[in-house]
Regions:
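Short hydrophobic/aromatic-enriched beta-strand-loop microsegments
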Residues: 59-65, 135-137, 227-232
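Active-site phosphate-binding/coordination module
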Residues: 21-118
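Mg2+-dependent phosphoryl-transfer enzymes with acidic/Ser/Thr/Gly-rich catalytic loops
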Residues: 4, 21, 178-264
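Conserved acidic, metal-coordinating active-site core of Asp-based
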Residues: 105, 109-209
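Residue-level detector of anion-binding/catalytic polar loops
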Residues: 37, 170, 226-227
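Non-catalytic pre-domain segments flanking phosphatase-related domains
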Residues: 1-7, 55
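Conserved ATPase-coupling elements of RecA-like P-loop NTPase cores
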Residues: 16-20
Length: 264
């Protein structure tokens, strides 16, 4: 049976503190040798993922900005993808709203709800909050669908969620930021649509694995055959009600390597 691997990045494939993936080397080699699509499924932007793929040495489909869109390299595995919209050198399936719509809401509510969005932060502030380097910050600000933000007053969260609902938007929590996004998108919906697409392309059922560590990964974990939680940097685990959930023994990329080797 064909397989797909969906993976979160920060705190899962990448270590929380230094963004390293060195300890995943053995599993990466096994995935490449087996020809299994490794689908980064992340809150990161297209620019961020493309740069990371270059460093990892892969050219695979990927899901960006918390399930907002799936990008597939043109001609991937020889598939005819002409039925999908073209975006640069990729084909795209869009699940989210435009960044302009998201920013309209953010700017209306940022003061009354004590939000500080990525679009308002200086590069220096983002470096301080994330530990990213200057180049990575530039990539992170090239957004198409969602706005990450810091909530200075947590008591405003419920009111903010209600307001977002009236705009057909929602608020979700990632590893470092909250995110404003379309009400009708999440990693789970993107995973479902991606699995359906690959089953059509392969003309057979596929087996799916997902690895994550944060609240915004739960929807992804709920819709795969083998859901895996990676131990957090502080030694805790994401709490879920997902049946048959697997847990890594190690944190970050070492835990990712451990679990991928177990199932690929």
């Amino acid at each position: 049976m064909k397989r797909l691997i969906f993976t979160d990045l920060d705190g899962t494939f990448l270590n929380h503190h230094n963004y390293s993936f060195e300890e995943s080397f053995e599993a990466l080699q096994k995935i490449k040798a087996a020809g299994v699509p490794l689908i980064f499924t992340t809150s990161k932007t297209k620019a961020e993922v493309e740069y990371l793929q270059e460093k990892v040495g892969i050219s695979e489909p990927f899901i960006v900005e918390n399930g907002a869109a799936l990008f597939i390299p043109e001609g991937y595995q020889g598939f005819d993808l002409s039925f999908l919209e073209k975006y640069d050198d990729k084909r795209i399936m869009v699940f989210g709203k435009s960044y302009a719509k998201v920013l309209e809401f953010y700017r209306r509510y940022k003061e009354r709800c004590s939000m500080a969005g990525l679009s308002d932060m200086s590069d220096e502030e983002i470096v301080h909050l994330t530990g990213l380097n200057q180049r990575d910050v530039i990539h992170a600000k090239q957004r198409d669908f969602t706005e990450p933000f810091i909530l200075k007053d947590k008591t405003k969260l419920e009111a903010l969620k209600k307001s977002a609902h009236t705009y057909e938007l929602k608020i979700t929590k990632g590893g470092r930021f909250y995110h404003i996004m379309s009400k009708f998108q999440d990693k789970g919906i993107a995973v479902i649509k991606t699995i359906e697409l690959f089953e059509d392309l392969y003309h057979e059922r596929v087996s799916s694995i997902a690895l994550g560590d944060s609240e915004n990964d739960i929807a992804m974990l709920e819709h795969v055959d083998i859901p895996i939680v990676i131990k957090k940097y502080d030694g805790s685990y994401l709490e879920t009600n997902v049946p048959h959930i697997q847990k890594s023994s190690y944190q970050g990329s070492k835990g990712w390597n451990e679990m991928v080797l177990k199932y690929v």
